[in-house]
């Protein structure tokens, strides 16, 4: 892992530094990569997740006037049940969702907290097809992380939790309706989508829709399972480097994943 700072130089080679995301009409059958953010594109368990969890618990204590143990129970229970604590809090309690997201994703020194793989920009840039970020985090935080990692411009769009809601309710991964609507808006087929994600529950739910699934385990905390390959996972990788086209194994993985997206 390496620390990114504002003064760090991008690890894109010169031709890729000039590269811009194409806005032309998408090619039918091109892979559509859906990258999770936390613990996928960077190591959130190192410092960011502990701070978010602490802030969430404190917010619940203050807003609902409950003890810490009850606040932790609500946070964990709603995350497991709905995919994001925000959904449970807004459905069952008088919580302002925007204030909650702002409060729990504010950091005194985000660059110092970030850890990411070396060569991340090169890995993402050389993958074939279209690339999106699909995260249950708020947009401001997601874009701040991507900017610090020098990879924001490599993604066609950042789909954050604010974009997942409809007129009636907030939604988040692993909601099926949200993913269908998201891909339809992107003019992308479900069969072309490949989700790269650390949360097995999200992969399991979305595999039912027929998308490709990549389970990344290298950033997961020690108490979570990281071995084996469940039936709903097409590929298990420890590092995004496993998808590098410059290596034989990476070419094989990408070939198997993208072969399924052909018309």
Can you annotate each of these PLM segments?
Residues 43, 133-135, 215:
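Hydrophobic residues in well-ordered beta-strands that form the structural core
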Residues 11, 16, 26-35, 40-119, ...:
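N-terminal helical cap/lid subdomain that shapes the substrate entry/recognition surface
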Residues 66, 95, 129, 188, ...:
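Short glycine/serine/threonine/alanine-rich loop segments
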Residues 110, 131-132, 168-172:
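Short, surface-exposed loop/turn motifs that are enriched in glycine and acidic residues
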Residues 119-128:
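Catalytic-core regions built around general acid/base machinery
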Residues 39, 133-136, 197:
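Conserved residues at beta->alpha junctions
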Residues 2-30, 125, 138-139, 143-263:
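Asp-based, Mg2+/Mn2+-dependent phosphohydrolase catalytic module
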